[in-house]
A protein has these predicted regions:
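Short, Lys/Arg-enriched N-terminal segment that forms or immediately precedes the first helix
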Residues: 1-10
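Short alpha-helical "packing" element that flanks the helix-turn-helix/winged-helix DNA-binding module
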Residues: 17-24
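Short capping segments at the starts of secondary-structure elements
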Residues: 25-31
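A short acidic, leucine-rich amphipathic alpha-helix
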Residues: 34-39
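Short, hydrophobic-biased segments on the C-terminal half of alpha helices
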Residues: 50-51
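Glycine-centered, phosphate/nucleic-acid-interacting loop/turn motifs that mediate DNA/RNA or nucleotide
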Residues: 57-58
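Short, Lys/Arg-rich nucleic-acid/phosphate-binding segment
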Residues: 62-69
């Protein structure tokens, strides 16, 4: 998994974004809370990370409460 994260960082993703993306590859759909728990990203940062991944077209959100990715 570390090699995948390093490769994603090479393409411009932050460490947290790469970890969130890998978490979603393993289990999706998932809520921000679930992604935070699985990827080891602080909940205070996970939604900003997911928003960036959405704007890059790498993930898409669905639903309202709770939003799943």
């Amino acid at each position: 998994m570390l090699e995948i994260i390093k490769n994603l960082e090479h393409f411009g993703l932050s460490t947290n974004a790469a970890r969130a993306y890998c978490s979603l590859l393993k289990s999706n759909p998932a809520t921000g809370y679930e992604i935070s728990s699985h990827a080891g990203i602080p909940r205070s940062a996970v939604y900003n990370v997911l928003s960036k991944l959405e704007s890059m077209g790498l993930v898409s959100g669905m639903g309202e409460k709770p939003k799943r990715y």
